């Protein structure tokens, strides 16, 4: 008879851009928000710019870590977006990703933030 694996749980999946300029702000903020060891973290160029990749990680985190919250962070001056990376575009993409994730996983809490290069996390939705 197969032995069931124990449930491994963390509260959140955090998705942010890989940009080195953000790390000094992101790591302390996440730790205060979710605790030292209570989150999965994914760092992708452009963060939600590649929604399909983000969705794969959300699905995986739901399956293997029974997450309850997804935290999506885009940022000012994102080079992965290039000239398209306006504040308006980031806000749209964050809200679009939030809507799509909530449609697939209605029980998940999905939070979106825009990180300014001065370290301010602006809550979007």
PLM region spans:
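Divalent-metal-activated hydrolytic enzyme cores
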Residues: 1-12, 17-20, 32, 45-54, ...
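A short beta-strand-loop structural module common to alpha/beta enzyme folds
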Residues: 37-47
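Ordered, amphipathic secondary-structure segments that act as subunit-interaction surfaces
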Residues: 73-74
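Short Gly/aromatic-enriched secondary-structure transition segments
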Residues: 27-34
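Short N-terminal binding/cap micro-motifs at the start of the first secondary-structure element
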Residues: 21-25
């Amino acid at each position: 008879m197969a032995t069931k694996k124990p449930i491994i749980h963390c509260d959140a999946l955090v998705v942010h851009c890989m940009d080195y300029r953000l790390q000094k702000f992101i790591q302390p903020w996440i730790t205060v928000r979710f605790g030292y060891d209570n989150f999965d973290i994914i760092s992708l160029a452009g963060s939600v710019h590649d929604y399909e990749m983000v969705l794969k990680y959300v699905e995986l985190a739901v399956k293997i870590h029974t997450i309850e919250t997804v935290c999506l962070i885009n940022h000012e001056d994102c080079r992965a977006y290039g000239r398209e990376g306006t504040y308006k575009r980031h806000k749209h993409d964050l809200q679009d990703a939030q809507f799509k994730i909530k449609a697939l996983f209605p029980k998940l809490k999905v939070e979106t933030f825009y990180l300014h290069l001065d370290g301010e996390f602006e809550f979007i939705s």
